[in-house]
Design a protein with these regions (language model features):
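Short acidic/glycine-enriched loop/turn segments that link adjacent beta-strands
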Residues: 39-42, 108-112
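Glyoxalase I/VOC metalloenzyme domain signal
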Residues: 1-9, 13-34, 48-101, 116-185
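Internal, conserved structured core segments that host functional sites
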Residues: 103-105
Length: 185
């Protein structure tokens, strides 16, 4: 397992409608951020100022997010983590089973961000280099997903053993509340 410090940043869920998903979360009295528009997505952060927030993403009519939702449907898109030194982190996971997405060649240089993937793994792992790592309590306490023993080992290797747990359904445990991801669709 990596000896490097890792801090969960956010968990992103690709949904058909960020407005509908945000409305579903209002019953929990979560802090729902403003809807933002980007080149390929509409996005809303839930408890965006807290460590390990929830990011709701809606694909626009074209682009990579639209292709993702058409291919796999709505659901978990990525889990973002922060590290102090991206190159040391990437060196530390050599041989762990994670693969570096080809887009990372450009994003490592331009944005100090890498994308880890693995066929069959239900999400992308976004690794961002930061100057400091927050130590505040988590908003998202855990995420359950149908993971194999090998996938759990890979998750542990990148410092997410406290976030990911294996279960047959995708659920998020936030601020003492449990939500099946399907409720956001």
């Amino acid at each position: 397992m990596s000896q490097l410090q890792v801090s969960p940043s956010h968990i992103a869920v690709l949904v058909p409608s960020v407005d509908k998903a945000a409305k579903q979360l209002q019953k929990f009295n979560f802090e729902i951020g403003l809807k933002e528009e980007f080149q390929e997505t509409f996005e809303i952060y839930v408890h965006g100022e807290k460590r390990n927030s929830l990011l709701l993403m809606e694909a626009k009519s074209s682009g990579s997010y639209r292709k993702a939702i058409e291919k796999r449907g709505p659901g978990l898109h990525h889990v973002a983590i922060d590290v102090l030194n991206l190159n040391l982190f990437l060196d530390s996971i050599a041989g762990s089973g994670w693969l570096l997405n080809l887009n990372s060649i450009k994003t490592i240089e331009d944005y100090k961000t890498a994308y880890l993937v693995r066929p069959g793994f239900p999400a992308i792992i976004e690794v961002q280099q930061k100057d400091t790592l927050p130590m505040a309590p988590f908003f998202i306490e855990s995420l359950t997903a149908p993971l194999s023993a090998q996938q759990l080992k890979m998750v542990n290797h990148i410092g997410l053993k406290d976030i990911f747990q294996s279960h047959r359904d995708f659920t998020i445990h936030m601020n003492n509340q449990t939500l099946n991801l399907k409720e956001l669709f």
